[in-house]
Amino acid sequence: MAKHLFTSESVSEGHPDKIADQISDAVLDAILQQDPKARVACETYVKTGMVLVGGEITTSAWVDIEEITRNTVREIGYVHSDMGFDANSCAVLSAIGKQSPDINQGVDRADPLEQGAGDQGLMFGYATNETDVLMPAPVTYAHRLVQRQAEVRKNGTLPWLRPDAKSQVTFQYDDGKIVGIDAVVLSTQHAEDIDQKSLQEAVMEEIIKPILPSEWLNTSTKFFINPTGRFVIGGPMGDCGLTGRKIIVDTYGGMARHGGGAFSGKDPSKVDRSAAYAARYVAKNIVAAGLADRCEIQVSYAIGVAEPTSIMVETFGTEKVPAEQLILLVREFFDLRPYGLIQMLDLLHPIYKETAAYGHFGRENFPWEKTDKAQLLRDAAGLK
């Protein structure tokens, strides 16, 4: 493979779309805390001074959607009208209905193992050995930059930072291996009284340098810090936000394919979410086992049907065992039926709000990031 560049981006927890994702998943978590078998599809819209929470929810639980919304916005850091959005005074509107009984009859079964998929669709999972978390480097470091922005904002290191921020990192590859970072973009919302020069210096010293490995930076690396020169108006005042609008940020930064389904606000019966997590789990264990350097899994479903309609394994020529054997290993060691994968990954718990910012993959505290089947796969493949 010739030399090439690859770019991925991320956004902070204060980005409007991510506010929406976090509210949707906070509602989901609150419901799952009381009713693990709830059916939840929660969508959120945010704009200056208001939040609209809608969707289809069938549950025995009662949750205070207004309180959950305000607490989520408050934790993110929008607590004053000067920021254009205030957790204490914004309007919170609710438009919640129940999940269609037509869908329910296709999902619920007397035998849990025969639980049908909540919808048709195709999902992808991916892993690569180019980072320690078996994720693509561009999106991994883009996430870490905006995580660091939130950290120094919240701990008072840079008190003039505001919640909205975006990052973008362009990596240089040679023959498929990382050789450097070509460009870094970091735009952060800020208070009115900080000048551009001071902001750029502080962002470089407190955010960029602590995160990006120095061996990948050189004199030709380009840095774009707040390149418009001003970013005071941000968050929902600058742009409206919607649940599910950052699906590439949420996954692999464009390095792998995407089936199109968003994650946040959906309970695990929705294979858009749970099967994408399972596909990541499969791909990561294959790479961790040393069966391939890169692995992409596709799985697909028909609504109301338990068995996947297809499973595909792509290793981009990096496989250490035949591709046909990899498919057999996946079918032997991973139950990709909806109920099976929910049990395999223990998904009926309130673990989702944390996923809703800084990527659903590559953070070791999530169950789909375990590599507990790597040795089993390696032994079954006959690798020493």
Swiss-Prot record:
GO terms for cellular component: cytoplasm. Catalyzes the formation of S-adenosylmethionine (AdoMet) from methionine and ATP. The overall synthetic reaction is composed of two sequential steps, AdoMet formation and the subsequent tripolyphosphate hydrolysis which occurs prior to release of AdoMet from the enzyme. Homotetramer; dimer of dimers. CDD domains: S-AdoMet_synt. ATP binds at residues 15, 164-166, 230-231, 239, 245-246, 262, 266. This is S-adenosylmethionine synthase. Pfam families: S-AdoMet_synt_C, S-AdoMet_synt_M, S-AdoMet_synt_N. Belongs to the AdoMet synthase family. NCBIfam families: metK (TIGR01034). One of its GO terms (biological process) is S-adenosylmethionine biosynthetic process. Pathway: Amino-acid biosynthesis; S-adenosyl-L-methionine biosynthesis; S-adenosyl-L-methionine from L-methionine: step 1/1. Its cofactor is Mg(2+); K(+). Mg(2+) binds at residue 17. Its main location: cytoplasm. Binds 2 divalent ions per subunit. Binds 1 potassium ion per subunit. The gene is metK. Residues 99-109 are annotated as: Flexible loop. It is found in: Cytoplasm. It catalyses: L-methionine + ATP + H2O = S-adenosyl-L-methionine + phosphate + diphosphate. L-methionine binds at residues 56, 99, 239, 270. Its EC number is 2.5.1.6. Keywords: ATP-binding, Cytoplasm, Magnesium, Metal-binding, Nucleotide-binding, One-carbon metabolism, Potassium, Transferase. K(+) binds at residue 43. GO terms for molecular function: ATP binding; magnesium ion binding; methionine adenosyltransferase activity.
